[in-house]
């Protein structure tokens, strides 16, 4: 945060996964409390139905209900339209994060890497490589 202030950035973009919306909300609050203007975009931006890309009801988390697919390119485009100066990713899926980086015009960093098995702390597996995970890796 202090590095971004030192670099003169005022307008931050936050691209986050819907599964980490609370974490995204808290991060945005913290950035605003430190004087940044914050624009955010959730992963389901654009509301494109999964059926539009050929997925069926059996592919949905909640069959029978409207379920938009993740759209990291739309997230990037929304933040581009808002002319963010620096973007922060919170929990985008592997692959989705790469698409976001590709299409975002502002420099981007990742604050939280999605890893539900390790409470979004993938380094935890490395810390435990010689103990708990020794026989699992």
Regions found by a protein language model. Give the residues of each.
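Conserved acidic residues
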Residues: 10, 85-86
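Generic beta-sheet signal
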Residues: 41, 90, 111-114
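Long, charge-dense
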Residues: 22-72
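Short, small-residue-biased leader/transition segments that mark boundaries at the very start
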Residues: 1-2
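Short, structured coil segments at secondary-structure junctions
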Residues: 34, 103-107
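C-terminal functional extensions of proteins
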Residues: 109-137
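Active-site glycine-rich loop that binds ribose-phosphate moieties when present
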Residues: 66-81, 92-94
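Gly/Ser/Thr-rich loops at beta-strand to alpha-helix junctions
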Residues: 16-24, 46-47, 87-98
